[in-house]
Amino acid sequence: MLLPSKLTKSHLPDSTQSLLLSSQVADWRGIHLEYHHKPKGEENSLVLDQLHLLCVETTQRPCDAHKWMDGRFQSRPIIQGDVFVLPKQVQFRERFEGAIDYILLYLDADWVAAVAQEALDSDHIEILPHFPQPDPFIYQTGLLLKSAVEAKGSFNQLYGETLALALSVHLLQHYAGRKASRKLASIAPAPSFSSNLAAIADYIQIHCDRNLSLIELANLAQMSLY
């Protein structure tokens, strides 16, 4: 089973000038969050090697935006709750006509592929680029992850990695290529599922003072991380 990587600065583009918040201190695996503010008229260009990017627009007022992605162009106002999906190795450029705030969610592309391999029994998965469109699930998940980083609670690591897994499955269901668009395979629970769940609950209660991870709990229950 491929374990998600911890995304360090070497994996990420340099965006410190507009950065307001980062999950670097959260010690998450498979996902990295950034919260940015960009002034009017700034232009961004980006190509990610081994990461998928979800950009969650949080600006309260509509803002005209011009985006170039994968050889296509779109010019329209973006609104709060819009999300655009930039897969790995896809060229992207944008310019805004006003100041904006947004959340960036970087996902480990190898981990997303591993989730697809286990859930869909397929290694021919391709996440497709999507211009901004409303996606309530990604929008709310982005806000939850941002709140988790701000809170720095004891369940921060487990919380973040669980939501990262949910985002990976959501991507495969709604933003993947034709070969990935079939329904996720249903996996029958093992006979010991209930006892495993109880063991996990007991373990969390006993170790509530620790920053537990999703990987640690999956190993405890001898269950797949996915």
What are these regions (language model features)?
Residues 182-186:
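Short, Lys/Arg-enriched N-terminal segment that forms or immediately precedes the first helix
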Residues 137, 141, 189-200:
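N-terminal positioning helix adjacent to the helix-turn-helix/winged-helix DNA-binding module
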Residues 121-180:
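Amphipathic alpha-helical segments enriched in hydrophobic/aromatic residues interleaved with Lys/Arg
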Residues 1-14:
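OB/S1-fold single-stranded nucleic-acid-binding modules
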Residues 11-127, 152-153, 157:
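N-terminal regulatory/effector-sensing and dimerization cores
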Residues 174, 199, 203-226:
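Basic/polar phosphate-binding segments, predominantly the helix-turn-helix DNA-binding elements
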Residues 109, 164, 197:
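Short amphipathic alpha-helical/adjacent loop interface patches that line ligand
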Residues 48, 106, 132-139, 194, ...:
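Alpha-helix N-cap/helix-start motif at coil-to-helix transitions, marked by capping-box chemistry
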